[in-house]
């Protein structure tokens, strides 16, 4: 019984150590730049970014954990366009996997996972509209006080995620949108 207690205490200590090493998202801004087929573009914005990541315990360069965006909060600045975006294209009411965009298995390239700082690139698994695909993009990580400020950008090809072509009265959004994210993380 004594050895079982020691194992449980060791596992609890390891879990606490990993949790203490986690980077937790604080304030964040997500902008999805949507280029229009007739020229110009509009932004869909939200601050509903959450999550935490931890350097992988397995020694992999990828982080454990994930970052998530509540797609029900995306705002384009026009009520009818918001309704069409959420109901007709993202279909957020279909539930889990549709109401949230999640980035996981984030692998920083050119930056140390233990003390990331500077410019580099990343790869990760993005789940949107119930579909998971690899995305890659640029990342810039800067130390700010006791935490980090992260900015990242990456393209998303809407047909890859089985999202219908956004069209209304002959005007539409091109297939590829650009996601720009800025957020703070602390331990």
List the model feature ranges, each with a label.
Residues 5-14:
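Bacterial N-terminal signal peptides
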Residues 3-5, 18-21:
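Hydrophobic membrane-targeting and insertion signals
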């Amino acid at each position: 019984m004594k050895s079982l207690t020691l194992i449980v205490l060791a596992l609890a200590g390891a879990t606490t150590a990993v949790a203490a090493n986690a980077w937790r998202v604080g304030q964040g801004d997500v902008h999805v730049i949507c280029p229009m087929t007739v020229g110009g573009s509009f932004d869909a914005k939200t601050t509903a970014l959450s999550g935490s990541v931890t350097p992988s315990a397995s020694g992999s360069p990828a982080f454990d954990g994930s970052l998530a965006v509540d797609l029900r909060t995306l705002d384009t600045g026009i009520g009818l366009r918001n309704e069409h975006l959420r109901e007709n294209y993202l279909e957020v009411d279909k539930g889990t996997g549709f109401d949230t965009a999640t980035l996981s298995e984030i692998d920083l390239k050119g930056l140390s996972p233990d003390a990331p700082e500077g410019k580099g690139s990343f790869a990760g698994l993005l789940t949107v509209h119930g579909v998971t695909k690899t995305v890659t993009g640029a990342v810039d990580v800067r130390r700010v006080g006791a935490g980090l400020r992260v900015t990242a950008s990456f393209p998303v090809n809407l047909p890859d995620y089985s999202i219908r072509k956004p069209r209304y009265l002959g005007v539409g959004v091109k297939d590829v949108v650009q996601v720009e994210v800025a957020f703070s993380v602390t331990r």
